[in-house]
Amino acid sequence: RMSAASMFFSTEMSLLAKLLRGKPLQMANEIHSIIWSFTYAFGMAISGFVVNSYGIKAAFVIDAFIFFIALVIFIKIDFVVKASITSDKIFQLIKDGFIYIKSNKIILHLIFLHSCVGITSFDALITILAKNEYKYIISVPLAIGLSNASRAVALMFGPVFISKYVTKENLHYLMIFQGFSIILWGFVQNDFYISLIALFIVGLSTTTLWSFTYALLQNNCDEKYIGRVISYNDMFFMLSCVLTTLFIGLMASLTSVDIITILLGVCFFAFAFYYTRILKWI
């Protein structure tokens, strides 16, 4: 299931890059992220109800049925995109993709830059807080659900207020804002209801940051290699998410959750500085 979802996502983002360029591409990325955020929040709410009322098997059957509906819808869509024709073998295509990235350093820099969004995959932090801090105030499942829902709502509405002000020249300020918002959340985590507000602020800039850095990569990549570059980018992005989760798990046994959160926020300051160093090449 996860392999299929990953393959679909890479194909989808490659297709968007072939259909659109520049600002329209960034807006398409934002719309995609908004839809994802809505379904993420809505899915959590529905899945909890289904699992509690009908069991796990029913949830899996419904999940598979949703994929079937999506397949029926996509079959009927006619995308006006010229199919790539190649006689190279798959391993040669993979090798050529890595050679292309190696010979175009800016692509490598942008892949690394986009990975900063993976730092916001701090679901483990929310779970730890719910089990250790919030269980005295509210049930653990409800604490996790409300925390994720608060961030998901912000992910949906953030681009409406922020994206029109973000440009290539001031993107680093958005990264700094993301860092400060995460640090703010770290300071107010002990109060569940205030932390919901802080999580909302954290989510406001994440969607725009994700879509803008993704658009930078898509716009700077040759169409011939866009599919492979997007796939490698997703691999690196997932690595960033995994490393963030491992970091949280390791540090949770060494220090407090608020310190971990603050360290994650500081990482965005480092990425903001890094972006200012590579901006002249973009």
What are these regions (language model features)?
Residues R1-F38:
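Cytoplasmic helix-loop-helix junction between adjacent transmembrane helices
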Residues S3-T11, I119-A124, D191-F192, L204-F212:
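Hydrophobic transmembrane alpha-helices of Major Facilitator Superfamily
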Residues S14, K18, I56, F60-K89, ...:
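Helix-loop junctions on the cytosolic side of multi-pass membrane transporters
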Residues I31-T39, L113, Y232-F236:
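Hydrophobic alpha-helical segments of secondary membrane carriers
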Residues S37, A41-A45, G118, A152, ...:
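Residue-level signal for discrete positions within transmembrane alpha-helices
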Residues Y54-V61, I99-P159:
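A single, central transmembrane helix in multi-pass transporters
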Residues F79-I111:
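Juxtamembrane intracellular "pre-TM" segments in multi-pass secondary transporters
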Residues N132-I282:
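C-terminal transmembrane bundle of multi-pass solute transporters/carriers
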